[in-house]
């Protein structure tokens, strides 16, 4: 049996999170750019077609390979959901990035999360730990993707 649990943890970024914010803005603008291009098409392309169309372009901007795949998958999801609900062209507002398991490292003892950002850089986030998290994050659970968000001057993972 599979169980999916979500734990939201506040984090503290070094240097006021400038590199993280730069990465999140670049991520959001890349997703928005692809959304704008896909919106004009009658049929949403497959992931393989999106990969061929956007992989080299996004890698050239400094994104890691797994970031690129998450970007075009996210754009495809947004376009499909909006079109199925007969909505207008979506405009992304939140600074949120979906991080693949190979693009982060977590040390539960030190309560730190390292994220891969642009141009193969890494930043360390110190996690604000709560006692209830020990029940879930004691090393017995396999961690999947991480969503990193920046909202009102606070970072959440």
Protein language model regions, located:
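Nucleic-acid substrate recognition interfaces
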Residues: 1-157
């Amino acid at each position: 049996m599979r169980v999916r649990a979500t734990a939201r943890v506040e984090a503290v970024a070094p240097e006021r999170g400038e590199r993280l914010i730069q990465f999140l803005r670049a991520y959001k603008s890349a997703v928005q750019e692809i959304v704008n291009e896909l919106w004009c098409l009658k049929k949403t392309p497959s992931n393989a077609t999106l990969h061929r169309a956007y992989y080299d372009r996004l890698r050239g901007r400094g994104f890691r390979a797994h970031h690129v795949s998450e970007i075009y998958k996210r754009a495809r999801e947004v376009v499909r959901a909006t079109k199925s609900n007969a909505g207008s062209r979506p405009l992304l507002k939140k600074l949120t990035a979906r991080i693949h398991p190979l693009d982060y490292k977590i040390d539960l003892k030190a309560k730190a999360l390292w994220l891969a950002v642009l141009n193969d850089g890494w930043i360390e986030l110190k996690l604000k730990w709560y006692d209830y998290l020990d029940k879930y994050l004691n090393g017995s659970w396999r961690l999947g993707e991480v969503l990193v968000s920046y909202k009102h001057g606070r970072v959440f993972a």
